[in-house]
């Protein structure tokens, strides 16, 4: 292929933008990259807004500094590539709490997403089942099996550990329940060790040992000035043509690549390209795949999503505990499932006037009806519940914002990784220049999405480099 490549990236979230940057870095000079975003805003779930005159995250708040192997995460590497490494800041308060019986108790250490590696350390919040985690003479999970996190943990530690520890931890990330979420997709490190170890305590410890972290090394980071700076820098570095408010409605295979149908039904724009990175959620991806790859579309489109709302308040001089925030088990009967004390957790957000920024997350999978309330009602309920948990009336907010994220968080059922692997294998065989990327396929979190986009870009480069066209 001698002429400049033309590559379309459908979806302007961080996965799509990471793909565009990698294409610019690694594809031949002159490659034409166009990013199509159906909304008017780039960055997907990365969105920095302003509250009481201060930048605040209305979407994703931070990223992991390390990947599961202990190496630098893809988010950190991207920030470094974009010249933002010096802007990375870390939490100044790391201790979080759980709401247990209406009060706050510190989250015990030594767990892996709430799954304990030391049963004595979690006794302050949950009572593990006595003598259930015994060596049965074989690995916990079969070599090719995938089960729910809840099934594994309940069988070894009992209900209370799941309901008070694991469920709220997973709920804070996925807005889902441990009994419904895939072990392989949501906790891959534990899944690997569970295929070798005979006890769950042993599997947790082995997973922790496989990704050692230096004492005191930060787990999370964010960018001073907000995560939208990552989005803006990626757009600039990609050198891509950015098409906002440009919905791609159809993909059609051609003799030389792909034809995109873009824009309104009555007057569509037809665009011919050599390759496509499809970096949109599973259901929109399935709609676009329904023509060229209907069997793949059927598998991809089965993924369900949870909706959430983030309620952020600016509170004048509230009495807050010295915590980064707290998680709420569903058994507590509260609307909120998590809260973050932004100005306590992140020292760079602290204000001399004592104004505090507090954000609460609302919404669990299957409970979308709770999100039908008007913004004012949602904010009032959050304010009331925060006051009750903290044991003191909070002052009235001087500013606030409700950000609703409909269908935001994928619910990876057991077997997701195998289903996705089969779909990708079929798609690669039939259409190597059409590649999937994003949270709906590879997992949530900024590093995973960045890596997903970069991997998709590399697949496109390989496919076009080997093309005879």
Each language-model region and where it sits:
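Conserved flavin/dinucleotide-binding core of flavoenzymes
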Residues: 2, 48-49, 107-116, 323, ...
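Conserved Rossmann-like nucleotide-cofactor binding loop
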Residues: 15, 41, 283
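Beta1/beta-strand and adjacent pyrophosphate-binding region of the FAD-binding site
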Residues: 2-15
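Mid-domain catalytic core of redox enzymes
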Residues: 246-359, 363-372, 376, 388-389
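Active-site/ligand-binding neighborhood in enzyme catalytic cores
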Residues: 134-251, 257
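Glycine-rich FAD pyrophosphate-binding loop
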Residues: 24-51
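Dinucleotide-binding Rossmann-like beta1-alpha1 core, especially the glycine-rich loop
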Residues: 52-140
């Amino acid at each position: 292929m001698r002429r400049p490549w033309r590559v379309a990236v459908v979806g302007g979230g961080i996965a799509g933008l990471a793909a565009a940057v990698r294409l610019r870095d690694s594809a031949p000079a002159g490659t034409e990259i166009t990013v199509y975003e159906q909304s008017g805003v780039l960055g997907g779930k990365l969105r920095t807004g302003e509250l009481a005159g201060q930048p605040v995250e209305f979407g994703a708040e931070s990223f992991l500094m390390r990947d599961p192997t202990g190496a630098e995460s893809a988010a950190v590497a991207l920030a470094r590539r974009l010249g933002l490494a010096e802007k990375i800041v870390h939490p100044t308060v790391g201790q979080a709490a759980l709401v247990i019986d209406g009060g706050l108790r510190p989250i015990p250490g030594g767990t892996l997403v709430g799954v304990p590696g030391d049963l004595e350390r979690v006794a302050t919040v949950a009572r593990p089942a006595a003598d259930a985690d015994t060596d049965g003479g074989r690995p916990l999970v079969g070599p090719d099996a995938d089960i729910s996190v809840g099934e594994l943990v309940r069988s070894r530690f009992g209900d209370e550990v799941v309901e008070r520890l694991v469920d709220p931890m997973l709920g804070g990330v996925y807005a889902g329940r441990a009994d419904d979420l895939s072990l392989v997709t949501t906790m891959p490190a534990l899944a690997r060790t569970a295929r070798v170890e005979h006890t769950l305590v042993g599997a947790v410890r082995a997973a922790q040992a496989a990704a050692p972290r230096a004492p005191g090394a930060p787990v999370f980071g964010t960018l001073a000035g907000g995560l939208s700076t990552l989005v803006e820098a990626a757009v600039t570095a990609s050198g891509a043509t950015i098409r906002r408010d440009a919905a791609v409605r159809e993909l059609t295979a051609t003799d030389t690549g792909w034809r995109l149908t873009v824009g309104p039904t009555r007057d569509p724009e037809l665009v011919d390209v050599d390759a496509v990175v499809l970096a949109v959620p599973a259901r929109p991806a399935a709609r676009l795949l329904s023509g060229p790859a209907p069997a793949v579309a059927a598998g991809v489109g089965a993924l369900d999503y949870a909706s959430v709302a983030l309620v952020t308040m600016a509170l004048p001089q509230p009495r807050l505990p010295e915590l980064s925030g707290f998680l709420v088990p569903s058994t507590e009967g509260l609307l909120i499932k998590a809260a973050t004390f932004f100005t306590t957790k992140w020292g760079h957000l602290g204000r001399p006037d004592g104004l505090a920024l507090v954000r609460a997350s609302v919404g669990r999978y299957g409970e979308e009806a709770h999100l039908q309330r008007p913004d004012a009602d949602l904010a009032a309920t959050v304010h009331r519940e925060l006051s009750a948990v903290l044991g003191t009336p909070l002052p009235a907010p001087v500013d606030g914002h409700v950000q609703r994220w409909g269908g935001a968080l994928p619910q990876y059922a057991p077997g997701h990784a195998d289903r996705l692997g089969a779909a990708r294998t079929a798609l690669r065989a039939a259409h190597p220049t059409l590649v999937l990327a994003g949270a709906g396929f590879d997992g949530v979190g900024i590093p995973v999405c960045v890596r997903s986009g970069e991997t998709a870009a590399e697949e496109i480069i390989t496919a076009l480099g080997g093309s005879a066209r």
